Every structure is written in structure tokens, then in C-alpha cells.
UniProtKB/Swiss-Prot annotation:
One GO molecular-function entry: ATP binding
Main localization, broad class: cytoplasm
UniProt biased composition (Basic and acidic residues): 96-110
Lineage: Eukaryota, Metazoa, Chordata, Craniata, Vertebrata
Subunit structure: Dimer of identical or non-identical chains, which can be either B (brain type) or M (muscle type). With MM being the major form in skeletal muscle and myocardium, MB existing in myocardium, and BB existing in many tissues, especially brain. Interacts with SLC12A6 (via C-terminus); the interaction may be required for SLC12A6 potassium-chloride cotransport activity.
Modified residues (Phosphothreonine): 35, 322
Any single Pfam family the record assigns to this protein: ATP-gua_Ptrans
Alphabetic keyword roster: ATP-binding, Cell membrane, Cytoplasm, Isopeptide bond, Kinase, Membrane, Mitochondrion, Nitration, Nucleotide-binding, Phosphoprotein, Transferase, Ubl conjugation
Organism: Bos taurus
Cross-link (Glycyl lysine isopeptide (Lys-Gly) (interchain with G-Cter in ubiquitin)) at residue(s): 45, 101, 107, 381
Protein name: Creatine kinase B-type
Length: 381
């Protein structure tokens, strides 16, 4: 849990080596970077809101690793964390985001007209398409560190802004604490709502404090545009629908996001953003675009093929299980999405998914007919 700074001062009575965590059995990005020397250098520092290096790393100390993915092992508590603790965050960001340097500049492109194709992914294979991102509101602490009052203020601001959306984006807000157990579970099963805070990453970082206070979901009337409020990020914006029309999903995503930003600006609030890291979010893995464009895709043959992991790697894609990050694939259905977030624009990332998914379908069709796929192996993107 985030501590007050008087507690941090108390800890400074012990030498740094006595406070250094045991990372000997760990496999996450933080554990690769954090040395006793770096810990000693950073441990007396804190951000203006009181977030310390111990708060940054706690989730990675408590969660040594993950069987499916290399976790990051740290979080930011506020916008300043990435600057105050940059000696820790910069190498983690470089490691996680394919060599992204502290001097690199991020690019943003939320113009759906720049996406080539994407309206014709075969619905016999692509069951659903989804694009999501996160946004943080400048001037508030991030979920690992925010107070109840901050969280409630974020909810109020967000609901006011979202209630101004109209046309096919018009919808309503559902506060988590006023939902029945059955309503919650139905939304979770339909992939509309974030899970209950059982994830050790959420729990250890302090993001689940006061649950379900000031958490909720806003969605439009046909449930194709959703905003999660106060889960891992202040806002998670999601556009989704059945079938393979990624172009339509991305267009709705860009339009909705642009309108939300305009509504916040009209109330004199802006999103956390800087030219180097792009949009600032709680987890360093989401910096930049924060964007994950994914499809649920049926690949019963390719999914079992020994080359499948290599194909995904070359296409800069990653797979998750059917139910998300902590789950296995059911019935040969995979959640396939872009592996990158930072250093590429939104349009570039969605383009990689569209082009990559087309190739995956072509490979699956070859394997259905008992043919080889060696000649279809892509070059490394």
C-alpha cells in the first residue's frame, strides 16, 4: 500500500541493503533492472504527492513472474513518477518497448482515414474486433496512489463528460456499487466489464483499495463503445463489436476518444501526455498509445503449430487466452493483438493487426487443407 512519507523517513534508519527486496526468484522487467545500488540512490526520493520507489516496485516484488507473459513489475503513482524515478523506469521502458530510448519521441495518429483496409477480415475466423486505450487526467494521482476523494472526483468529471456524447455514442453510466452480483457477472462474461479485483497485480499495487467505490462502466446503447472508470487507469476507452470490421471499430474509437478529450478540455482538464512517453498511464507497458487492437480469432490448426509463436513474433503480435491475460485458449480461439504500445502511432499499430490477421487466416486455411505454411512465413516487421 502507498505509505506516507514519514513512514519512508522511518525506513531510512535502516541501511539500503537491509531494505532491498529479495528478487532472486523473480522474472519481471523491474527485477532485471533494480540493483542494490540503484535502490540506494532512489529510496529517499518521493514525488510531490508522496509516491516512493517502494510503492513503484511493490507489485513486482509480490508477483515474481507470470507463466504466459513477461510482466513489468512496477507502476507509477502519478505523472511525476516517470521523471522522479526515471533511472528505474527508463531502462524498463527500453526493455519492454523494443529499445525505446530516453531521447526518443512518440507519435500520435488518431485519424481513421489513414488505416488501409481492415473492413474485410473474414468473419468465419474473426469472431470479434476490439480497440482499447487508457487515459489519465492531469492533476490527479493514478489509481495505485489516489485518494477516495480524487477517485470520486474523477468519476464525477468522467460521467459529466460522457453524458454529453450523442448520436451512436449516446449511453449511460452504471456505478459498480449499485449493480447486483448477477448484473456484474453478466457484464464480465460478455467481456464488457473489468473483472473483480482478484488480480494480484491490481491488489499488490494498491489499485483495488476501497473497491467498488467510484468505479463503474459507461457504455453506449448498443454496447459497442465503453468506458471503464477507475480500474487500472482513470479511464479505459473501448470500441468493440462482433465480426471482422476493424475499420468500423477503429473509426468509432477515434471519434469517441476525440470527443471525450474535447469535453474534458471544455472543463479545463487535460490528459497526461508528453512528447517522449505519449499518453501517461499507470503501467509502463501501456505508455505511448496505450492502444491494444485485438481480435478473437479461430485458429485451431495454426494455434497448435510449432511455428505459431515465431509467426506472431515476426508480425509484432501477441496472443492471450480467450478470456484475457490470465487465461488459456478455449476451442482454438485466441485473443491476438499488437505487442507494441510506444514508438508507433495508433494507426500503425491497428494496421499491423489488420495485415497480420489476414496472414494468420491464410496460414490457417493452408493447414486446413493439409498444406505447408513455410513459404508464408513473414519477415520480421
Amino acid at each position: 500500500m502507498p505509505f506516507s512519507n514519514s513512514h519512508n523517513t522511518l525506513k531510512l534508519r535502516f541501511p539500503a541493503e537491509d531494505e532491498f527486496p529479495d528478487l532472486s526468484g523473480h522474472n519481471n522487467h523491474m527485477a532485471k533492472v533494480l540493483t542494490p545500488e540503484l535502490y540506494a540512490e532512489l529510496r529517499a526520493k518521493s514525488t510531490p504527492s508522496g509516491f516512493t520507489v517502494d510503492d513503484v516496485i511493490q507489485t513486482g516484488v509480490d508477483n515474481p513472474g507470470h507463466p504466459y507473459i513477461m510482466t513489468v513489475g512496477c507502476v507509477a503513482g502519478d505523472e511525476e513518477s516517470y521523471d522522479v524515478f526515471k533511472e528505474l523506469f527508463d531502462p524498463i521502458i527500453e526493455d519492454r518497448h523494443g529499445g525505446y530510448k530516453p531521447t526518443d519521441e512518440h507519435k500520435t495518429d488518431l485519424n481513421p482515414d489513414n488505416l488501409q483496409g481492415g473492413d474485410d477480415l473474414d468473419p468465419n475466423y474473426v469472431l470479434s474486433s476490439r480497440v482499447r486505450t487508457g487515459r489519465s487526467i492531469r492533476g490527479f494521482c493514478l489509481p495505485p496512489h489516489c485518494s477516495r476523494g480524487e477517485r470520486r472526483a474523477i468519476e464525477k468529471l468522467a460521467v459529466e463528460a460522457l453524458s454529453s456524447l450523442d448520436g451512436d455514442l449516446a449511453g449511460r453510466y452504471y456505478a459498480l456499487k449499485s449493480m447486483t452480483e448477477a448484473e456484474q457477472q453478466q457484464l464480465i462474461d460478455d467481456h464488457f466489464l473489468f473483472d473483480k479485483p482478484v488480480s494480484p497485480l491490481l491488489l499488490a499495487s494498491g489499485m483495488a483499495r476501497d473497491w467498488p467505490d467510484a468505479r463503474g462502466i459507461w457504455h453506449n446503447d448498443n454496447k459497442t463503445f465503453l468506458v471503464w472508470i477507475n480500474e487500472e487507469d482513470h479511464l479505459r476507452v473501448i470500441s468493440m463489436q462482433k465480426g471482422g470490421n476493424m475499420k468500423e471499430v477503429f473509426t468509432r474509437f477515434c471519434n469517441g476518444l476525440t470527443q471525450i478529450e474535447t469535453l474534458f478540455k471544455s472543463k479545463n482538464y487535460e490528459f497526461m501526455w508528453n512528447p517522449h512517453l505519449g499518453y501517461i498511464l499507470t503501467c509502463p507497458s501501456n505508455l505511448g498509445t496505450g492502444l491494444r487492437a485485438g481480435v478473437h480469432i479461430k485458429l485451431p490448426h495454426l494455434g497448435k503449430h510449432e511455428k505459431f509463436p515465431e509467426v506472431l513474433k515476426r508480425l509484432r503480435l501477441q496472443k492471450r487466452g480467450t478470456g484475457g491475460v490470465d487465461t488459456a485458449a478455449v476451442g482454438g480461439v485466441f485473443d491476438v493483438s499488437n505487442a507494441d504500445r510506444l514508438g508507433f502511432s495508433e494507426v500503425e499499430l491497428v494496421q499491423m493487426v489488420v495485415d497480420g490477421v489476414k496472414l494468420l487466416i491464410e496460414m490457417e486455411q493452408r493447414l486446413e487443407q493439409g498444406q505447408a505454411i513455410d513459404d508464408l512465413m513473414p519477415a520480421q516487421k
